[in-house]
Amino acid sequence: SDILELMLKARDLGYPADYLVRSQHNRVLPGGGKLWDQVMAQTPLGRIRFMLPAGRGRKSRTVEQDIRVQRISLKGNAKGSIEVTCVIATEINAPEGAKPVQWRLLTNREVNSLEQASELIDWYRARWEIELFFLILKEGCRVERLQLGDKDRLESALAIYMVIAWRINGV
């Protein structure tokens, strides 16, 4: 979920720290109105297409999404407001019976082109591969059940299991 405090901390650190988070809440904007409604009112920046991998109870399929982007100010806490870019990717023409893929993302990066927005969508899509890798590591390899009392043994076992999880994930 989006954590406004995290966004403010990234801004206040004094050195670059890019973030991309899923927008969990349809926040009220300083001038009134709601975040998602305002961004969805924008003309699409363009359209992207990618292959959505198979998931639990879902076959792989091609997804086409319209991309809408807007730089916007969100109300902060005592530290004031924060400027973010909201990217909303909405699937068009989803197959019958399939839930359309829609992602609402917030980032501190500025987005001025479809290419920049597409790069952020690719970052978000990579997250699923990372989550699948760790799911295989935890549930398939059962690394949390390892009872190795020594740090070196644990590191050696994890190194082996990570290769196994990587190979299973790549199959």
Task: Write out the residue ranges for each language-model feature.
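Single, function-defining residue in the core of a domain
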Residues: 1-171
